[in-house]
Structures are given as structure tokens and as C-alpha cells.
């Protein structure tokens, strides 16, 4: 399993999510613990890059941006966005 490491700012961003997106957000974290490379690359020009993103929630209006540190088996949450 990968360890999820939230950035201090992501706690505030998660608190701002709509209630109906929280379960989907929790499911993203569960997937990231086992398969973080399944997310899309943040930069399409660098498809194997360690900075990834995962859309979630109703209408895929949420996005988690994260960094995979393979050697440490860590996933660092960089940003949680809601565009709804």
C-alpha cells in the first residue's frame, strides 16, 4: 500500500467540498492507496510523470492533484479542487 500524505492546504480544500462529493473523494483516496499510477498525468506531454490527477464527484467536477513518490511508497496530495 501507498501512504497518503496530505499537504496542509488540502484539509481546507476538502472541507470546502460539497457533501455529495465526499464519498467519491474518499473512494479516490482508497484507490490511490493501491494504484496511484492509474490516475491521468497532470502534464499530457509527460505521460510517465509523477504528478497525476484524478477526477471525481458528480459530473467529475472534482479533481485531486497528487505526487507519487515510488521509492517511499507515498502519495502526496497537492490540491483538491471543486469546479461545480
Report each predicted region and the residues it spans.
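Basic, Lys/Arg-enriched alpha-helical interface segments
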Residues: 1-61, 68-84
Amino acid at each position: 500500500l501507498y501512504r497518503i500524505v496530505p499537504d496542509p492546504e488540502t484539509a481546507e480544500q476538502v472541507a470546502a467540498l460539497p457533501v455529495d462529493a465526499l464519498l467519491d473523494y474518499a473512494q479516490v483516496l482508497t484507490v490511490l492507496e493501491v494504484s496511484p499510477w492509474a490516475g491521468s498525468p497532470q502534464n499530457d506531454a509527460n505521460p510517465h510523470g509523477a504528478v497525476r490527477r484524478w477526477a471525481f464527484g458528480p459530473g467529475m467536477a472534482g479533481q485531486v492533484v497528487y505526487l507519487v513518490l515510488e521509492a517511499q511508497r507515498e502519495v502526496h496530495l497537492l490540491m483538491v479542487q471543486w469546479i461545480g
